A protein has these predicted regions:
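Binuclear metal-dependent hydrolase catalytic cores
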Residues: 1-244, 309-337
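Binuclear metal-ion centers of metallo-dependent hydrolases, dominated by the metallo-beta-lactamase
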Residues: 184, 196, 250-337
Length: 337
């Protein structure tokens, strides 16, 4: 598939505790403005006919219900922290409705943590009722997502669990070992990181387990490497939208991937310098350097004022500092395209 058009819905724009915070009586946590009610950070991306989720935190169930989601082509995980992975058990509902395993794309260290945190998912023979996942190991290289990438239909067998239905009608267990659940990418062809490559010209990773489809059934995703304190994490570029959360620094080599954006999302946790997140001033500096048409702040905490006040403050700061981007706070339910 070609073209830059993508549509992103902010499902959650709050910190790891969400907003309001349990027990807090500050003005933001008591606000009646729905824009001050923030689920844990997550986004739903509709891109060239595919529906892609970025992160599945503890609010995943309510986020899916709020958007009426019945199908996901892929779940991309930025990193391994619970506010980004804590809702993955709830893909069971989509397994049942969609009759497909959830296609999850994550780095190797994230996969290793998922195995520790969800041991019943990786127990063999499979535990009846456990969610069905297919995991694809990625890194900072571009990779391909294909629509309905698995042709294997899930069938629920009472008191036994999910099986795959083969073309001849035979039912077989979904996985007999860990190897059956993991698809690692082959080596990608080396390419210069340039504006041209950021638009999709370089050779992406292709996963062996993906069913063969036409070019009209696939998109190339461009990961953005960053650090969350010392933890390597990923953001993602979808056409002319880049979604970045939970970063405190971006390597110089990654900025070429961020050229020519219409929309940029950046995490902003507080006014002050933070060990694992961008401060407000760091975010403004990045917006001015990258110069997207619009910059949206997410992963917001209750340390910022209520939405209306914060938006006016951002307008003033951008005007005073001559920031070359329109910077606004995102809020749950906001749609950009």
């Amino acid at each position: 598939m070609t073209g830059a058009g993508a549509r992103l819905t902010f499902l959650g724009t709050g910190t790891s505790q969400g907003v309001p915070i349990i027990g807090c009586q500050c003005e933001v946590c008591r606000s009646k403005d729905t824009r001050d009610k923030r689920f844990r950070a997550s986004a739903l991306v509709e891109y060239q006919g595919l529906t892609i989720l970025v992160d599945a935190g503890p609010d995943f169930r309510m986020q899916m219900l709020g958007q009426g989601v019945r199908h996901l082509d892929a779940i991309l995980l930025t990193h391994n922290h619970k506010d980004h992975t804590g809702g993955l058990d709830d893909v069971r509902s989509l397994n049942y409705i969609d009759r497909r395993a959830a296609e999850i794309y994550c780095e190797k260290n994230v996969l290793e943590d998922l195995i520790r945190e969800y041991p019943y998912v990786f127990k063999f023979p499979k535990y009846p009722g456990a969610p069905e996942w297919m995991l694809h190991v990625i890194d900072e290289r571009p990779f391909i997502i294909r629509k309905d990438s698995s042709d294997k239909e899930l069938v629920w067998v009472h008191d036994v669990g999910y099986h795959y239905r083969l073309p001849n009608g035979q039912l077989v267990p979904t996985a007999r070992s860990l190897d059956d659940m993991i698809d690692e990418a082959p080596e990608a062809v080396a390419a210069d990181v340039s504006l041209q490559s950021a638009k999709g010209a370089w050779a992406p990773c292709v996963f062996s387990g993906l069913a063969a489809k036409t070019d009209e059934d696939q998109v190339t995703i461009i990961p953005i490497r960053g650090l969350h304190d010392k933890l390597p994490v990923l953001g993602f570029r979808f056409g002319d939208i880049a979604y970045i959360t939970d970063m405190s620094s971006i390597p110089e080599s990654e900025f070429a991937k961020l050229e020519g954006l219409k929309h940029l999302t950046l995490n902003t946790v507080s006014y002050n310098t933070h060990h694992s997140h961008f401060s407000l001033q760091e975010t403004l500096d990045l917006a001015d350097r990258i110069r997207p048409e619009h910059t949206w702040l997410t992963h917001l905490s209750h340390s910022f004022p209520v939405h209306e006040t914060f938006q006016k403050e951002l307008e003033r700061m951008c005007q005073e500092q001559h920031i070359h981007s329109i910077v606004r706070p995102a809020y749950d339910g906001l749609v950009i395209e």
